[in-house]
């Protein structure tokens, strides 16, 4: 995909700068940005940009048809389309169910010194921690299996990643039994796609200078 940099100044807001780029002075109404995806750093930045675009179009006596204005990781929602990706509540519930006290005692790489009583609160905290670790790995375009195969990783750490991969496999099976896809798997497979969704021809990174590697691979 072709890349082009645009440098903004310090005298106007980012929303005004980006709206001027998307709707230049020589553009003629009616305005349509349906084929453009704008990535913004926060939801609030997205709201300000939409307002700036609406005001700019209004000054030309028109409106503007918008494409997605989203934060970077919502790009995966576009790529996933109608795929049955599990939401965060389903993922959390299944991880909690998989991390039974009996299974946790078998995962001595992940839990070398588990508490005597692995109650709901402890298992819930452990599940959330592992979900967060997977999300951080996915941001770098990695999975636990990648670290198992990395010879530079300490063997003790490889044991931990091997345990995590084991739990991931069980979670994946449980999700599949309910007809769901693992969102991390969808992220990693989407990042490997060579082309963006056909409905969009332009992606604008507006004030997102430090995007995650997994997002960069998609663009």
Question: In which residue ranges do the predicted regions lie?
Answer:
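Short active-site oxyanion
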Residues: 34-37, 202
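Conserved RecA-like helicase ATPase core segment
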Residues: 214-219
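N- or domain-start disorder-to-order transition segments that initiate the globular core
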Residues: 1-26
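Structural motif
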Residues: 9-11, 41-43, 203-213
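Basic/charged alpha-beta structural segments of nucleotide/phosphate-handling enzymes
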Residues: 40-48, 53-198, 213
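Short glycine-enriched loop/turn motifs at secondary-structure junctions
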Residues: 31-32, 61
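A short acidic-Thr-Gly-centered motif at the start of a beta-strand
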Residues: 23-31, 191-198
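Conserved phosphate-coordination/catalytic loops
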Residues: 8-16, 177-185, 209-210
């Amino acid at each position: 995909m072709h890349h082009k940099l645009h440098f903004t100044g310090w005298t106007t807001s980012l929303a005004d700068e980006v709206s001027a780029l998307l709707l230049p002075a020589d553009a003629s109404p009616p305005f349509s940005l349906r084929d453009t995806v704008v990535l913004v750093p926060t939801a609030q930045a997205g709201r300000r940009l939409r307002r700036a675009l609406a005001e700019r179009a209004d000054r030309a006596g028109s409106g503007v048809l918008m494409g997605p204005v989203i934060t970077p990781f919502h790009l995966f929602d576009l790529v996933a389309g109608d795929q049955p990706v599990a939401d965060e509540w389903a993922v959390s519930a299944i991880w909690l169910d998989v991390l039974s006290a009996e299974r946790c005692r078998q995962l001595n790489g992940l839990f070398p010194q588990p508490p005597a009583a692995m109650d709901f609160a402890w298992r819930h905290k452990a599940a959330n921690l592992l979900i967060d670790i997977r999300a951080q790995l996915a941001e770098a375009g990695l999975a636990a299996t990648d670290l198992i195969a990395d010879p530079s990783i300490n063997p003790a750490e490889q044991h931990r990643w091997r345990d995590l991969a084991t739990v991931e496999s069980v979670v994946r099976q449980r999700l599949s039994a309910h007809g769901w896809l693992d969102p991390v798997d969808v992220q990693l497979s989407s990042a490997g796609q060579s082309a963006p969704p056909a409905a969009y021809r332009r992606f604008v990174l507006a004030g997102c200078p430090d995007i995650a590697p997994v997002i960069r691979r998609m663009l």
